[in-house]
């Protein structure tokens, strides 16, 4: 399938070419998938990158926008995003959270509902791959949140590029992309992204952590070294899990032998 002219024009930019190349190194799926689009810079950049990838690889790709109805303007925003994506032949469907909204734990419950809706859509279409826009800043935030909660090794490195959740593969191809690069793609391609006011609300733990990380960065935190630390912890966790599995198999074999 040919890449539409308006998408080809966007690909003529050198920085876009470089970011697309990096994306293709991290995304090697060869079957149909669903992409979650919120309207933020990360998910709009993901919509653009996956669209190019799906055309190049002749793959079926569906785009889903979830309207949580937590803000009065959310429905208009969802419609605007759908229209904007359509300009680039990215066909999106809007799913709506219709139930009564809770007064407490709103962010975590909205996240759970979003995944419920997305997983249902995956099952409806018999698609096992769901692609989401978590990026490097999310990886750092998740690490610090888990550390504050006293998580063990597995919890500290829980944000993986591929996570199996029942029958669904949750895929995060942007984990080594910085937020500023995703903002660049969104601005350059769509000249738009949604600024969610909850991203500035310091009553939410994630926003407090984000501000602390930014303070660390301003005081010399080396993001490359932090990324390397998380990468090394992941390797340690993988090694540990490997030996646990080996030990289980060995004990299972010995149990069978003893019973004989």
Question: Locations of the language-model features?
Answer:
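Core alpha/beta nucleotide-donor-binding catalytic domains of modification enzymes
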Residues: 1-212
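ATP/NTP-dependent adenylation/nucleotidyl-transfer catalytic domains that generate, transfer
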Residues: 165, 203-260
């Amino acid at each position: 399938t040919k890449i539409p002219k308006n998408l080809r024009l966007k690909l003529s930019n050198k920085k876009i070419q470089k970011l697309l190349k990096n994306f293709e190194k991290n995304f090697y799926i060869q079957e149909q998938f669903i992409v979650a689009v919120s309207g933020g810079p990360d998910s709009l950049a993901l919509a653009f990158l996956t669209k190019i990838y799906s055309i190049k690889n002749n793959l079926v790709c569906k785009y889903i926008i979830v309207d949580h109805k937590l803000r009065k303007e959310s429905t208009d925003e969802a419609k605007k995003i759908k229209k904007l994506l359509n300009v680039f032949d990215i066909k999106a469907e809007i799913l709506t959270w219709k139930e009564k909204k809770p007064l407490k734990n709103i962010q975590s419950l909205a996240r759970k509902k979003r995944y419920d809706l997305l997983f249902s859509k995956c099952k409806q279409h018999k698609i096992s791959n769901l692609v989401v826009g978590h990026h490097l800043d999310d990886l750092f935030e998740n690490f610090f949140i888990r550390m504050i909660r006293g998580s063990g090794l597995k919890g500290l490195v829980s944000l993986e590029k591929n996570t199996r959740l029942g029958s669904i593969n949750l895929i995060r191809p942007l984990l080594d992309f910085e937020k500023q690069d995703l903002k660049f793609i969104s601005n350059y391609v769509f000249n738009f992204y949604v600024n969610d006011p909850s991203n500035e609300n310091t009553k939410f733990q994630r926003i407090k952590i984000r501000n602390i990380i930014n303070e660390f960065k301003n005081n010399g935190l080396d993001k490359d070294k932090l990324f390397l630390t998380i990468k090394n912890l992941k390797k340690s966790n993988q090694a540990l899990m490997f030996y646990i599995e080996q030990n289980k198999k060995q004990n299972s074999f010995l149990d069978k032998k003893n019973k004989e």
